[in-house]
């Protein structure tokens, strides 16, 4: 259960970082 939550948060963090990188590169 905790493992699923951690992996979900990890995916969310990766997505946020990717999105921020796209905006900051412009």
Curated annotation (Swiss-Prot):
This is Delta-hemolysin. NCBIfam families: PRK14752.1-1 (NF011336), PRK14752.1-4 (NF011338). Its main location: secreted. It comes from Staphylococcus aureus. One of its GO terms (molecular function) is toxin activity. One of its GO terms (biological process) is symbiont-mediated hemolysis of host erythrocyte. GO terms for cellular component: extracellular region; host cell plasma membrane; membrane. Keywords: Cytolysis, Formylation, Hemolysis, Host cell membrane, Host membrane, Membrane, Secreted, Toxin, Transmembrane, Virulence. The modification N-formylmethionine is found at residue 1. Lyses erythrocytes and many other mammalian cells. Pfam families: Delta_lysin. It is found in: Secreted; Host cell membrane. It comes from the Bacteria. Changing residue 3 to A: In strain: canine. The lineage of its organism: Bacteria, Bacillati, Bacillota, Bacilli, Bacillales. Belongs to the delta-lysin family.
């Amino acid at each position: 259960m905790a493992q699923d939550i951690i992996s979900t948060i990890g995916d969310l963090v990766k997505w946020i970082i990717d999105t921020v990188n796209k905006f900051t590169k412009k």
